């Protein structure tokens, strides 16, 4: 049985509220869970103390048992000092794709030809 520490959505439409739960990876997002270990209210200010509540003892116990946190929960655990999360770094994220680079090269070549033709006149 693969265990996940993840968010289960609650609250009304357009008013999300999440429970931080330990659940079997095969169970539905908002379905059956083993234990609730905290809450997350994204509507509160980022510096509000009640935004994320987490029972660190339970979280530590489940991590020792092999439960894998999702990305968002890993951020919460990192902020609580329970887990060291590697910062993601994707230097190629802002670069355009191959075809866009080819089109830009074509445009630059045409602009260079046009400037040469204009200077030749």
Swiss-Prot record:
Highest taxon above the source species: Bacteria
Gene Ontology annotations of biological process type: translation
Positions with biased composition (Low complexity): 111-121
Entry keywords, A to Z: Ribonucleoprotein, Ribosomal protein
Region (Disordered): 85-121
InterPro entries registered for this protein in UniProt: Ribosomal_bS16, Ribosomal_bS16_CS, Ribosomal_bS16_dom_sf
Keyword Phosphoprotein: no
GO cellular component: cytoplasm; small ribosomal subunit
Biased composition annotated in UniProt, kind: Basic and acidic residues: 85-110
GO MF: structural constituent of ribosome
One matching Pfam family: Ribosomal_S16
NCBIfam families in the record: S16 (TIGR00002)
Family assignment from sequence similarity: Belongs to the bacterial ribosomal protein bS16 family.
PANTHER family membership: 30S RIBOSOMAL PROTEIN S16, SMALL RIBOSOMAL SUBUNIT PROTEIN BS16M
Protein name: Small ribosomal subunit protein bS16
Source species: Azorhizobium caulinodans (strain ATCC 43989 / DSM 5975 / JCM 20966 / LMG 6465 / NBRC 14845 / NCIMB 13405 / ORS 571)
Gene: rpsP
